[in-house]
A protein has these predicted regions:
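Transmembrane helix-bundle signature of multi-pass secondary active exporters and lipid flippases
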Residues: 1-14, 46-50, 81-88, 142, ...
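Membrane-proximal transmembrane or re-entrant/amphipathic helices at the cytosolic face
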Residues: 156, 160-166, 184-238
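Membrane-interface junctions at transmembrane-helix termini in multi-pass inner-membrane proteins
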Residues: 82-114, 129, 158
Length: 238
């Protein structure tokens, strides 16, 4: 499930990452940071658009996919992993700038250490008899640490403001969630579980969140990027 969602987001980021490398290479650091903001926002917002209906209907999706043989805690595992994927998508834009700079030592060392430390912590949690989902929550926390550490490392490479990052990336994402999450809940709670409810919930969630994303979360330059991306897809299909 998460692999399919991530594949969709990768197609979006592919259009922006080369521009980040090019901007950094010619010394246009302002454009580099602006592209990083845009890629971070686009990555998590596009993931939300396709992931939210799946998160709502995860029990039905698993039943449709696996039949009666749904493993214990599978739904919980997937929901937590999707949350981890949101953080990873935030980090992918930061990673693009770090790789464009070529100054990767600290980034790689810190990332490796954080991933390494999470393993014994998860093992210790299980040895104490904690719920199996605790392993994934621990992974979520360490992924969050990695995202925070990545931003501090990036600040040592290129000048940017944490406040600007919050305003350009996190605030529009929070606005998208607040403005779009409630409408799909109406058919979700009113209709019986089944394929028809899944279609209606998915349609409302995707269309509603897409509209909010385009008209509220994006600035003018980002709308031009999205328009260009959509036009390119339409030309390919023709």
């Amino acid at each position: 499930v998460t692999g399919g969602l991530q594949a969709f987001v990768v197609n979006v980021s592919t259009a922006i990452r080369p521009q980040i490398v090019q901007s950094y290479a010619i010394g246009n650091y302002t454009r580099t940071i602006n592209l990083m903001y845009s890629l971070s926002k686009a990555s998590i917002c596009f993931l939300y658009i396709v992931a939210y209906p799946i998160m709502l209907e995860i029990d039905y999706v698993l039943k449709l996919w696996l039949g009666a043989n749904v493993p214990d805690f599978a739904a919980d595992f997937i929901l937590i992993v999707i949350c981890i994927t949101f953080l990873n998508n935030l980090n992918s834009a930061v990673s693009a700038v770090v790789h464009a700079s070529g100054i990767m030592r600290n980034y790689q060392i810190v990332g490796s250490l954080i991933n390494l430390v999470s393993i014994p912590v998860a093992y210790y949690a299980l040895s104490l008899g904690h719920h199996p989902t605790s392993v994934f929550w621990i992974s979520f926390v360490f992924t969050l640490f990695m995202q925070m550490a990545s931003l501090f490392i990036l600040k040592g490479i290129i000048k940017f403001s944490f406040l600007s990052y919050a305003k350009r990336v996190l605030f529009p994402f929070a606005l998208l969630i607040l403005a779009s999450f409630s409408l799909p809940l109406i058919p979700f709670f009113l209709l019986p579980c089944g394929f028809m409810r899944f279609l209606i919930v998915s349609a409302i969630a995707v269309l509603g969140s897409s509209a909010v994303f385009y008209f509220i979360s994006l600035n003018h330059s980002e709308k031009l990027i999205v328009n260009s991306f959509v036009a390119k897809i339409l030309r390919i299909k023709k």
